[in-house]
Amino acid sequence: MRFVLSFIFLIASSLSVAAHKIPAFTGPDFTGVYQCTGLDMHEGEYKGKVTLKLKKEHSQAQYGSYDFLLEVPGYGRYPGHMAANGLSAAMHFALENQSTHDFGTGISQFSKNAKGQWQFHKFYFEPQFKGGNSGFEDCVKQ
C-alpha cells in the first residue's frame, strides 16, 4: 500500500511540474542601442539614445522583459523597464533627478525599416511633469 501511495504521489508531482513549465522566449529580441528623435509637448524637439537589454530569465513565449535606458543630452538619464508582446511594447521611465517629477509611461510599436533595422514609434505620457505632458519618439537601432 505504501508503494502505491508513493507511486501516486510521484506521478501527481510530475504532472504538477509539467503543467507549470514556462515556455521558452520566442519573441523578437530588441536588444541594442537606438538613436531617437522626439517631440515633447513642453520641451520641443530633442535627440536621444535608447538602450534596451533583454532579460531572458523574465521572458517567455512572445512576451519579452527588458531593461530600458533613455539618455537625452542636456536633460539626463531616464532608466526604466519595458514589457513587450510581439511587436508592441510598453515602457516606464524616470529621470534620475526626481525633483522635477519627470517620469512616465510609453507605448510603442516595433517594425523593421528598409535596411532591416529594428525601429519603434513611441507615444508617452508624464502625469506630473509641468502639470502633465506627452510626446512622441521615433528610434532606429544602430
Regions found by a protein language model. Give the residues of each.
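Central antiparallel beta-sheet cores of small beta-barrel/beta-sandwich binding domains
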Residues: 20-142
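Bacterial N-terminal signal peptides
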Residues: 5-14
